[in-house]
Amino acid sequence: MARSKFERKKPHVNIGTIGHVDHGKTTLTAAISATLSTLGSTAAKKFDEIDAAPEEKARGITINTAHVEYETDNRHYAHVDCPGHADYVKNMITGAAQMDGAILVVSAADGPMPQTREHILLAKQVGVPTLVVFLNKEDQVDDEELLELVELEGRELLSQYDFPGDDIPFVAGSALLALEAVTKNPAIKQGEDKWVDKIFSLMEAVDTYIPTPERDVDKTFLMAVEDVFSITGRGTVATGRIERGIIKVGDTIEIVGLRETRTTTITGLEMFQKTLEEGLAGDNIGILLRGVQKKDIERGMVLAKPGTITPHTQFEAEVYILTKEEGGRHTPFFPGYRPQFYVRTTDVTGTINQFTADDGTDAEMVMPGDRIKMTAELINAIAIEQGMRFAIREGGRTVGAGVVSKILK
């Protein structure tokens, strides 16, 4: 039989496993991969293939992440799993692997632990919109009441961080026993093994509870300006990569950031030296702007659909500060620290005014390797929105990464 060609007929969703160390995140990833491979559309990935996660760089930070893909009857998934706790923190803050939703893994034998709490907090801060919970190691719990207690504790913890604790699906099972059953019998079908069935139940919950994300092209138009030049007789061209949305010749847009917001009309679009009628999310494109001088627009501004993004100077953010070994600072810093914030395409100087620990108390200083909530104020207003990622730099060297959790001014 000839191999069928891969066609993306199903909606695509990015998810990941989060939770405390040793609660079984990677085993669960392998169990899902193995279980769904029995449906025949994707090959199983083994535990050690996932565990030996390759290094990748995002915003100047090295992160280990494993990427696994699999399909249910309804969807195509890309799943990320990180080997170490620090990798999770860095991945979630840099948005290296975006998550439309996540499976929170909690050991039914131990209940929620410190990193369970930390990952829920992080998911909230960095904008992972939806969680589903897998209570792993159910085989190690003899008492049904204990299982109910762990679930109750989990739901309370989720509600504490503004997730809908009462509505989130909880599925109990054993990733290890499911993985062993499928490994022993790769042709296993739904209904033949209780542990494998629990993985199917989990994925059913993921399929129905985690919404299909809005595609980038369906969002409102935004492009960060990377370069500007003038074409004699035609006007000013701003180039960059379209972050989201669609743009057409004749559309009205706003130029936002660094100066007064102004409105202009698009008179032409170019890509690879050719003119085109519309540009889509992901395109590297040149946009010809009506009545705009080269001196009026610069790198660091954004072009956007009118009324969709505004310039700001003050925000709260969740940040990760690199260790010395990662190429970061060797010494701590204190409130009043003035680094550059690299946002989209440009550096803007700002002051960090305050640090807040996870428990809500003020922190006096920040050490390399810390994750902290901070309040910053930029010297120039730029286009900022909740969930936006940035790097913290000192003289061109990345010393941290962050994500905007709240706009203040």
Curated annotation (Swiss-Prot):
Classification lineage: Eukaryota, Rhodophyta, Bangiophyceae, Bangiales, Bangiaceae
SUPFAM superfamilies in the record: EF-Tu/eEF-1alpha/eIF2-gamma C-terminal domain (SSF50465), P-loop containing nucleoside triphosphate hydrolases (SSF52540), Translation proteins (SSF50447)
Alphabetized InterPro entries for the sequence: EF-Tu_GTP-bd, EF-Tu_GTPase, EFTu-like_2, EFTU_2, G_TR_CS, P-loop_NTPase, Small_GTP-bd, T_Tr_GTP-bd_dom
Coiled coil: none
Protein name, UniProt field: Elongation factor Tu, chloroplastic
The UniProt record lists the keyword Lipid metabolism: no
Gene that this polypeptide is encoded by: tufA
Superkingdom of origin: Eukaryota
Binding annotation for Mg(2+): T26
Statement: the UniProt record of this protein carries the keyword Ion transport: no
Alphabetical UniProt keywords: Chloroplast, Elongation factor, GTP-binding, Hydrolase, Magnesium, Metal-binding, Nucleotide-binding, Plastid, Protein biosynthesis
GO molecular function: GTP binding; GTPase activity; translation elongation factor activity
